Amino acid sequence: MACTLRLTIAALVLLGICHLSRPVAAYQRCSRYWYSWLPYDIERDRYDDGYRKCCYCRNAWTPWQCREDEQFERMRCGSRYYTLCCYTDDDNGNGNGNGNGYGNGNGNGNGNNYLKYLFGGNGNGNGEYWEEYIDERYDK
């Protein structure tokens, strides 16, 4: 019995060490969004009209640290505030992220978003995703 207990405790300790040593994201819910915390990086996933929208953020102190395709954002989660430079894979919140990345996806997007260039997209190109994202976030 004592041997089994010792083995169980040793296994749990090893399991805990292995779990903590993995570079696995810890998930936290803030409002209706899930934030996945990675080292110096936050991946934010949300669902809108059945499509998955991804937003990739990194820590920043000032807006001048953000690149041209990034948006400076100050987010509150619980009692803590975070300042971030973020970019998205959807130009206007309507596309589903399919396409070849160089053209206009399915014929109705302009294909000029940085992530569309990398991964493709079929947004309709008539609005900025960030405006819709911020409006949706604060209107609810």
UniProtKB/Swiss-Prot annotation:
Keywords: Disulfide bond, Extracellular matrix, Secreted, Signal. Component of conchiolin, the organic matrix of nacre. Only expressed in the dorsal region of the mantle. Residues 1-25 form the signal peptide. Its main location: secreted. It is found in: Secreted, Extracellular space, Extracellular matrix. The keyword Disulfide bond applies. GO terms for cellular component: extracellular region. May be specifically involved in the formation of the nacreous layer. Belongs to the N16 matrix protein family. Heterooligomer; disulfide-linked. Pif97, Pif80, N16 and other proteins form a complex. This is N14 matrix protein. It comes from Pinctada maxima.
